[in-house]
Amino acid sequence: SDAGTYDIKVLGKGENFTDGRGHNETRFDAGGRYWAFADFKPTGGLNQVNKTEINVLGTPAKAIAYTQAKLSANVDGFSLSMDAGHDGTGFSSGTQQHIPVSIKQGGKAVDPATFENYLGEKAHLVMVEVASKEFVHTHPSVENGKLDIHTTFAKPGTYRGWLQFQTDGK
């Protein structure tokens, strides 16, 4: 089947490692083809991303086709809403995009400037293009009480994204 129809999910996150080795335990709920991304910065080096295909025995989950934009989410008591590009018409590839993200908790706006630093930043956004599995990692800035994502999509496509931030040690 088409690689672009496989579901893309965050299955687990490793921890900071100082000894050059890493460990991550992940439970796969279904068999099938998965991609693992290791995003790291060696001491004195530049950011690197290693991508590895993992084939898990068992019955694969039903493939999911992403055909509709989803620019909002409710997770752990927070509501997030992403603006559809700078002019509200969508995103473009090949040019710098500024994408504001509004965050609420209990219906009230949350200023991301109040977030704790997590791995040295107020937030991390990881996006993966569904068909090519292109990996994008960016650190949104805090502007006007919102997170502002500054990124360039190299190619047109459907991207799935995960935003990480920390409040109250979580």
Where is each model-derived feature located?
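N-terminal soluble domains immediately following signal/targeting peptides that reside
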Residues: 1-170
